[in-house]
Amino acid sequence: MNQQILITAVQLGELIGQGRCVVVDCRFDLVETKKGRIAWLEGHIPGAGYADLDSDLSLPIGPDTGRHPLPETEKFAGFLASLGWTEDKLLVAYDEGSNAIAVRLWWLMRYYGT
């Protein structure tokens, strides 16, 4: 499978205009955990949903887990559905800084085969 992973702003605009993608804002701060959602509320790419690392892309920390355990399959599928994502649409994730949370969302989609 040969898929383009990175796109330009112009390509994103075209995809949005064609209704062919779901856009997800993944901004998150590990110290100030509400900072990303606040930034999304203050401004984001039009139509973009928000992915919260702690509540959408991870399970709660347990006694035998790491800092951000993988979400269960059903939870992750439900999150994607809540964004309006279906298999016929591209999912475009964006972030700021290191883009680590956007990459996590991309990786979770690969991991779960979506």
Model-derived segments and their meaning:
Residues 1-114:
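Cytosolic catalytic domains that perform sulfur/thiol-centered chemistry
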